[in-house]
Each structure stands twice: as C-alpha cells, then as structure tokens.
Swiss-Prot record:
Sequence positions that bind [4Fe-4S] cluster 1: C34, C39, C45, S273
Cellular compartment(s): Cytoplasm
Organism this protein belongs to: Ehrlichia chaffeensis (strain ATCC CRL-10679 / Arkansas)
Names of required cofactors: [4Fe-4S] cluster
Ranges for domain Radical SAM core: 46-262
GO cellular component, one term: cytoplasm
Name of the gene: lipA
Family to which the UniProt record says this protein belongs: Belongs to the radical SAM superfamily. Lipoyl synthase family.
Matches recorded under Gene3D superfamilies: Aldolase class I (3.20.20.70)
Name of this protein: Lipoyl synthase
Classification lineage: Bacteria, Pseudomonadati, Pseudomonadota, Alphaproteobacteria, Rickettsiales
Record bears the keyword Metal-binding: yes
EC top class named in words: transferase
Annotated binding of [4Fe-4S] cluster 2, by residue: C60, C64, C67
Length: 297
C-alpha cells in the first residue's frame, strides 16, 4: 500500500462527544458506515454529532473492490431498526440525518421498504429533521427506486463511484447506466428532491473520463456531485493508482460548477456524507438563487 501524502493524514478520533455518539449507536444496535467503511473523517464528524447510519445489517451481498464493508450472507432484518434509529436521532438532536445501507440483493424489494420505514419513523418523531438517503441500486428490482422517492427524502444520493471503464474491476455487480437511470428516475418521480452522486478518483481514471461522468450526471438532472480520493482499505482491495493533488480537486470543482451542478464538494477527504447538513443548507440557497435569477430574466 502506498504511503499517504500529508494532505490525507488525519488525527486519531477522540473526545467526549465522539465516545457519546459511539456508545449511543451501540446502545440502539445501529451500524454506521463511518465505522464499517473506515471513513477517515469519523473523528471530525462524530465530534460534531454527525453520523451516517447504515441500515439493513452490517453484511453486504456484494464485494466491491473498493469497499471495506463485510460481504457474505446477511442476517435477517431487525424489525426494530427504524424505531431505534428515530430514537437515536432524537437523542443526538440531529437536524439532518444521513441513512445508507449495505446491498441486500437477497431481499424481494432490495431493502427499499426498510428505507421508507426509517424515513417515516424519523418524521413521526420530529417533522423538522431533514433526511438524506444514500441508497444502493436495489438490483433494479421493480418499484424499489420509486418507493423510496415517493417517501420524499430531502436528498436522494446514489453514488456512481467510478468511471464506466473501471466498473468491471471496481463494481463488478453494478451497472453504470442503471445508476444513471436510478438518479434520473428519482428526479422524474419527485422533482423537489435534491439528487446527489459521488465519484472516487485515484483508481486509474483519466480527467476526460471524469468530465464525461459529470456530463452524464447532469444529463440525469443530478444537483450535487461529490469527488474524493480513493483510499485502499486493506491490501486485498483495489490498489491506489495515484494520489490526486488538492489543486486538481479544485480544478474538478471549477469544471463541475461550469457544467451546471448546484453544489460541488471536491477534495481529498470528501466523502458522500461529509458536511452533509451544511451542504444541504447551501443546496437550498443555491436553488433559491437559481430560481430568482431565472425569474429576473
């Protein structure tokens, strides 16, 4: 594994709030992608009481070459998970919550119904909490995407992850154009929902391929793109081809905005849920400004 440049080095997570969040997640038997995927931002986020809850269990039915989440045969769904999630959101006094999941290709609806239950339970407890979902592709199961879109999360995120050429190596069980179809379907079903997608760089892609992904996402009416450095979780995972410099990330941000995205987060440590609450507020302001500009013209 390559040694990391200085701009990717972070402090070890610690602090009273960090441990409070960790203990609360354990108390309610909730998984977080922060821990399961070994996110480098866990210390910063948890000390701000920001956590991305991972529902549908901790075992994924796929084994993507970039992901640190355990794969295999998953356990049965926890019927109490939606209620426990809502309780934890209340105790943490979250204003914006991010819900993601493992892939559950074994379930008839891919787990989409469980997403809906989680959204409904959180809103039952507090209608003011804004909700962001980061869903898998549900294996293109009939009605799954529409079911979650109809539940009207404030943000619907589905990560494109990498360029089409690398899918066979990095996401062998996924299909690039199905991910685009999912994002387009969400916007068609519920135009008010902000759509979001993320891509990792440093896997061997070219700049031209990244620009094409940006074009494809804009063609699917995606509002928000996140671009971050791929980090190899273990020697068994896909190797890092190179570390993209902060200056290159700034350039990607400039290009993405020029292509019409409402919001762009681009940087070495950017992840799908990084600063999600703050970015949601910026998204709303940017959309309002866009409407005002269109109205004045």
């Amino acid at each position: 594994m390559r040694s990391k440049p200085d701009w990717l080095k972070v402090k070890m997570p610690t602090g009273d709030t960090f441990y409070q969040v960790r203990n609360l997640m354990k108390l309610y038997k909730l998984n977080t992608v922060c821990e399961e995927a070994a996110c480098p931002n866990i210390g910063e986020c948890w000390n701000k009481r920001h956590a991305t809850v991972m529902i549908l269990g901790s075992t994924c039915t796929r084994a993507c070459a970039f992901c640190n989440v355990v794969s295999g045969i998953p356990d049965k769904l926890d019927p109490h998970e939606p209620q426990n999630l809502a309780k934890a959101v209340g105790l943490l006094k979250l204003e914006h919550v991010v819900i993601t999941s493992v892939d559950r290709d074994d379930l008839e609806d891919g787990g989409s119904g469980h997403f809906v239950e989680c959204i409904e339970e959180i809103r039952k407890n507090d209608q003011n909490v804004t909700i962001e979902v980061l869903t898998p592709d549900f294996l293109n199961k009939h009605g799954a995407i529409e079911k979650v879109a109809d539940a009207a999360p404030d943000v619907y995120n589905h990560n494109i992850e990498t360029v089409p050429r690398l899918y066979a190596k990095i996401r062998p069980k996924a299909r690039y154009f199905h991910s685009l179809y999912l994002l387009k379907t969400v916007k068609y079903k519920n135009p008010k929902v902000f759509t979001k997608s993320g891509i990792m760089v440093g896997l061997g892609e070219t700049k031209e391929e990244i620009y094409q992904v940006m074009n494809d996402l804009r063609s699917a009416d995606v509002d928000f793109i996140t671009i971050g450095q791929y980090l190899q979780p273990t020697p068994k995972h896909a190797a890092v081809d190179r570390y993209v410099t902060p200056e290159e990330f700034d350039h990607y941000k400039y290009v993405a905005y020029s292509k019409g995205f409402l919001m762009v987060a681009s940087g070495p440590l950017v992840r799908s849920s990084y600063h999600a609450g703050e970015d949601f507020q910026r998204l709303k302001k940017n959309r309002a400004a866009m409407f005002m500009h269109a109205k004045s013209n």
